[in-house]
Amino acid sequence: IVTVDCSDYPKPVCTLDYMPLCGSDNKTYSNKCNFCNAVVDSNGTITLSHFGRC
């Protein structure tokens, strides 16, 4: 199981770094910050499917 530590999130601003992650909602997030903000917003219902684009 692959996981990402989102304990430091949410953050008000994300960088534009492009290191895509695929969420369990089948959406590609451009980087960890955007992914973790979505995880927090979803109350943890979104999880990491895999690294890279969906």
Swiss-Prot record:
Q: Where in the cell is it found?
A: Secreted
Describe the location of the Kazal-like domain by residue ranges: 4-54
Q: Which domain of life is it from?
A: Eukaryota
Keywords of this entry = Disulfide bond, Glycoprotein, Protease inhibitor, Repeat, Secreted, Serine protease inhibitor
PROSITE patterns named among the record's database cross-references: KAZAL_1, KAZAL_2
Q: Which GO terms describe its molecular function?
A: serine-type endopeptidase inhibitor activity
Q: Name one GO cellular component term.
A: extracellular region
Q: Where is this site: Reactive bond 3?
A: 16-17
Mainly localized where? Answer: secreted
Glycosylation site list: 43
* InterPro entries assigned: Bifunctional_prot_inhibitor, Kazal_dom, Kazal_dom_sf, Prot_inh_Kazal-m
User: Which Cys pairs does UniProt list as disulfide-bonded?
Assistant: 6-36, 14-33, 22-54
Q: Where are the transmembrane segments?
A: none
> What does the comment on domains in this protein's record state?
Avian ovomucoid consists of three homologous, tandem Kazal family inhibitory domains.
Question: What is the protein's given name?
Answer: Ovomucoid
